[in-house]
Regions:
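Bacterial N-terminal signal peptides that target proteins for export
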Residues: 1-8
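Bacterial N-terminal signal peptides
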Residues: 8-19
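Short glycine-/aliphatic-rich beta-strand segments at the starts of folded cytosolic domains
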Residues: 43-55
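Conserved redox-active cysteine motifs that mediate thiol-disulfide chemistry
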Residues: 56-67
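Short amphipathic alpha-helices in soluble, non-transmembrane regions
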Residues: 65, 106-114
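Short acidic amphipathic segments
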Residues: 65-87
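Conserved short beta-strand edge segments in small beta-sheet-based binding/regulatory domains
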Residues: 116-129
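Short, low-order "capping/linker" segments at domain edges
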Residues: 129-136
Length: 136
């Protein structure tokens, strides 16, 4: 019985460190990395904006962001993921805009804040150039 107890403790001691940190959120990426990601997301697409939401680094925590942003009247909820795609690696929220509607940066800022995150920038592409606007 004593040997069995030692074996169980040894197995527990070896397996426990493997699970530590497995549910860690993604670390903050640099603005340069985020700009490249935004350019890839928005390239060749119209009616789409991206928002940098500081702290948005866990996919399950971001569910509230999708719920809050998709409730905005200019979001095309007929698109996949209710028109709101979450990228926790780059801390980006991509929003599909309904045809004929315009984006309201103040409404996006409030929706993301209400979900518990800090919106920093809104990105669009105009004439193949990335345009960044502060929404803090």
């Amino acid at each position: 019985m004593t040997n069995l107890k030692y074996i169980a403790i040894l197995i527990f001691a070896l397996v426990l460190p493997m699970g530590i940190g497995s549910a860690q959120p993604n670390p903050e990426v640099s603005q340069d990395v985020r700009n490249v990601a935004v350019q890839k997301i928005l390239e060749g697409r119209s009616g789409v904006v991206a928002v940098y939401a500081r702290g948005l680094c866990c996919p399950s925590c971001a569910i509230g962001v999708r719920r809050m942003v998709s409730a905005l009247d200019f979001v095309d909820t007929e698109k996949p993921e209710k028109g709101v795609v979450i990228d926790p690696v780059n801390q980006l929220v991509t929003v599909e805009v309904k045809a004929g509607k315009t984006v309201d940066p103040k409404a996006i800022r409030k929706a993301i804040q209400d979900a518990g995150y800090a919106p920093v920038h809104i990105y669009t592409v105009v004439a193949k150039k990335l345009v960044t606007q502060s929404i803090e």
